């Protein structure tokens, strides 16, 4: 197995680049819970600090960063609402980034998957798992505060509408949304580029300012991620 030779801070807070002796580079985050991984990812020790390798084929946020995301609104102390948290792969790296003074509310609809997310949250006190349907944000309004960032990764035909509805409940004015657009979940017959354009128009018609659109190939085929700012 290749060995790490250096770890460098990227231009994004609490996100690092690990260089290995085989010449490869990979993203990593500083492990909030030393000694424990989440999804089988490699733990990397460098100069007395433990990092977790961040696999872009398992995490769309990592893929977006490697594909040129200009800015990551998720930083130390950020409050994040994550729709579609699944078993905790990406939200665990969000947990590393925001540190203990941040909060990550993870909404997941599947009871079986939430059980896995709960196991992750047991060791990570800044993750708050919620078994809920993202179509009904009023059902978790009493436990989720206003957030700085809304991250949406749900496989539904009306995923953009669900994201906008949640933003109206929870996203601060001038807060950011990272929306994963899953073209094949919306329409299997259309060109993904047409779908991306139509979904971005929905956002812009709902007081979102588009900052960047990133095609996630080769990490996720027929997926894009849209970074936008909510104007309220």
Swiss-Prot record:
Q: Which CDD domains match?
A: AdoMet_MTases
Name the UniProt key words of this record, in alphabetical order: Methyltransferase, RNA-binding, rRNA processing, Transferase, tRNA processing
Q: Which family does it belong to?
A: Belongs to the methyltransferase superfamily. Fibrillarin family.
Q: Which Pfam families match?
A: Fibrillarin
**Which major enzyme category is it?**
transferase
- The name on file for this protein is Fibrillarin-like rRNA/tRNA 2'-O-methyltransferase
Q: Which HAMAP family has this protein been placed in? A: RNA_methyltransf_FlpA
Picking any one GO molecular function of the record gives: rRNA methyltransferase activity
The entry describes its oligomerization and partners as: Interacts with nop5. Component of box C/D small ribonucleoprotein (sRNP) particles that contain rpl7ae, FlpA and nop5, plus a guide RNA.
Biological role stated in the UniProt entry:
Involved in pre-rRNA and tRNA processing. Utilizes the methyl donor S-adenosyl-L-methionine to catalyze the site-specific 2'-hydroxyl methylation of ribose moieties in rRNA and tRNA. Site specificity is provided by a guide RNA that base pairs with the substrate. Methylation occurs at a characteristic distance from the sequence involved in base pairing with the guide RNA.
**Which residues does S-adenosyl-L-methionine bind?**
89-90, 108-109, 133-134, 153-156
Instruction: Give the E.C. number(s).
Output: 2.1.1.-
Q: Which GO terms describe its biological process?
A: box C/D sno(s)RNA 3'-end processing; tRNA processing
Signal peptide span per the entry?
A: none
């Amino acid at each position: 197995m290749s060995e790490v030779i250096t770890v460098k801070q990227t231009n994004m807070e609490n996100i690092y680049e690990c260089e290995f002796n085989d010449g490869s580079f990979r993203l990593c985050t500083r492990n909030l819970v030393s000694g424990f991984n989440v999804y089988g990812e490699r733990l990397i020790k460098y100069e007395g600090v433990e990092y977790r390798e961040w696999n872009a084929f398992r995490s769309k946020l990592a893929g977006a960063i490697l594909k040129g995301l200009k800015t990551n609104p998720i930083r130390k102390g950020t409050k994040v609402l994550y729709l579609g948290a699944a078993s905790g792969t990406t939200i665990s790296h969000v947990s590393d980034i925001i540190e203990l003074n941040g909060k990550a509310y993870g909404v997941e609809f599947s009871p079986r998957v939430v059980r896995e997310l709960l196991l992750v949250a047991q060791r990570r006190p800044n993750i708050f798992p919620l078994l809920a349907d993202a179509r009904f944000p009023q059902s978790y309004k009493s436990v989720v505060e206003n957030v700085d960032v809304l991250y949406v990764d749900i496989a539904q035909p009306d995923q953009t509408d669900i994201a906008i509805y949640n933003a109206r409940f929870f996203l601060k004015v001038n807060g950011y949304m990272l929306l994963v657009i899953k073209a094949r979940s919306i329409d299997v017959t259309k060109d993904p580029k047409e779908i991306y354009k139509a979904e971005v128009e929905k956002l812009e018609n709902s007081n979102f300012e588009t900052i960047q659109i990133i095609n996630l190939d080769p990490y996720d085929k027929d997926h894009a991620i849209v970074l936008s700012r909510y104007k309220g």
